[in-house]
Structure formats: C-alpha cells, structure tokens
Amino acid sequence: MEVTNEIKTKPTQHSVKELRSIGIQPDVLLCRAKNKIDNHIKNKISLFTNVHKDAVFSAQDASTIYQIPIEYKNQKIDDYILKKLRLPHKKSVIKPWVTFTNKLKKCKRKVRIGMVGKYVELADSYKSLNESLLHASVHNDTSLEIEFIDSEDIKKTNMKMLNNLQGIVVPGGFGNRGVNGKILTAYHARINNIPYLGICLGMQISVIEFARNVLGLKKANSTEFDLSLIHI
C-alpha cells in the first residue's frame, strides 16, 4: 500500500498473519503497488511473513493487462512456481505474447467504435467483444477506442451522436427494451455507410431495419418482441 509515495508493508504483513492464523502459509506473495517494489521492501515483507524473499514478487500497475504476464516472466515467477511444484522446465512460448503487447503500444492509427446496447453502464458486460475488437484492431496496427452508447438514449432527433464513429457494433441482448434505438442505429449506419456489425440480436435488428425501410414491410419485426406478426 502506498501512502505519500511510500510503500507500506503493514497491510501485507497483517493479511499473511490472518492467513497463518487459520493454518494457511503462503508459498508466494504477489504484492500490488503502483510501482515496482525494491529489494529492501521485499526483504522486509519476507522477514515478517516467513515467505522467502525470492518468492515475493512485484505486481505493479501496468498500462495494459497484457503487460502483466511479461512483468511476471521478467521476475522469473514461472521458474519459481515450476521449482516449487517440482515440474520440468519447458521452452518459453511467451515471444508471440510480447510481440502482440509491443504492437499494442505502438499502433500507428486510431479507430473509434460505438458499442450500442442496453447494458453499457457496465462495460465488462461486453468483455469478450471488447477484447475481440482490441485483438482485431492491433492486428491491423490500429489503436481502439470504444464508445459505449445506451440504445435507449438514441432517438430520431439525436442520431448525429453516431456521426463521429468509424464503426458500430450492436451486440446480443434480450427483451424489447432499447430495441427502437438499435433499429435507428442500424438505419443510420446503413444510410451513412458506417460499417455495422450485428451479433445475435444485433443481426436481427439489421434485418428488421432493412425489411422496414428498404423492402417497405413497415411492421416487420421479430417474434421475440411481437407474436402477432405478418412479416417475421
């Protein structure tokens, strides 16, 4: 724990003490801190926790979560764990990971993608999609910015909020809440040639929008929202 830029070891000591009081002696400690902890701090933690100083590792903040395995590798935590578990050492396969992480930090271009859904107040609701978009953007040497937009906020009068996007993703969902906003989003993307990726419900939305506004089937919908339909 950092207080006025000084790392305090008491919280770690107390936590390990509590573990030992219930019969658990840690083999390895990962010490969270803003910056890398030095040998003096490691020695102090080791002294008061009965954990060998070589098993005290720094878990400092990183610019991206993908940097963290590299930091652990640099501290040789993998070697220590293998030795502790008496497992054979194998050739490291971290090089592709390092290549990806370095590329992530040096992307030459930038893209802004809108994620239009109804669970956007918690970005991790779409965690797998977020990471998939990130991987795709890095592969194309492009840094990614995702703008999360609540589909219930999208009206005919404010669709211009979508104009600053280079692409739109409408993910899956359930129920009819926010559906009209998603249909407006698909419409806006189509007439303005904004790349649109519809996943699950998002794909249904694009079909509904096209049926209504291009094919003239004004009441086209999904049975998920309306069972008394002519055009399904």
Regions found by a protein language model. Give the residues of each.
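N-terminal beta1-alpha1 cap of cysteine-dependent amidohydrolase-like domains
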Residues: 1-230
